[in-house]
Amino acid sequence: RNYSLCSNPADRDFYQIAVKRDAAGRGGSISMADDVNEGDLLSVSAPRNNFELHPRATKFLFVAGGIGITPVLSMMRHLKTQGNDQFRLIYCTRDPESTAFLEELQGPEFEGKVEFHHDHGDINNALDFWPVFETPTNAHVYCCGPRGMMDAVADMSGHWPSGAVHFESFGVDASAY
């Protein structure tokens, strides 16, 4: 099974992942949540990056839903290490209690960079992405999360320049994010 790294790519001594336990899943997340502890050594293959920052991009808009924050957080950590703070994150979750990395994202390192949207599990409270994408900017967009959220971002950003909007899919269904 593949998992997105959420650690800074510059940190080569360890890999950090975050896995949401899915009782309805095929067992991978249950095993990771129930049988693996922080600090355990696991046999892994070398990372592959199919969702990388565009090398010439200088401004970034990140959109994450639920545990889709993992690759986005890695990118944000990398940009901060590089001295680039030209980014913004829109992070959609059910509620603050289920928001991964909430404390870090509310901390001083990302102050003023993160907008949280909590739908409380009601699709009628999903974020309206049109105001975000109505006017294209020179930012590159990186989106990872549930299929429904990614479809909404794709629909709202269809008029953006080709190659400016990037998606990472990891098999989450279209239920509320």
Indicate residue ranges for each PLM-predicted region.
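Short, conserved phosphate/pyrophosphate- and ester-handling motifs at nucleotide-, phospho-/glycolipid
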Residues: 5, 68, 146
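Ferredoxin-reductase
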Residues: 1-41, 59, 93-96, 104
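Conserved S-adenosyl-L-methionine
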Residues: 57, 78-87
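Reductase modules of NAD(P)H-dependent flavoproteins
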Residues: 93-177
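Short, glycine-rich nucleotide/cofactor-binding loops
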Residues: 60-70
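Short, surface-exposed secondary-structure boundary micro-motifs
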Residues: 47-48
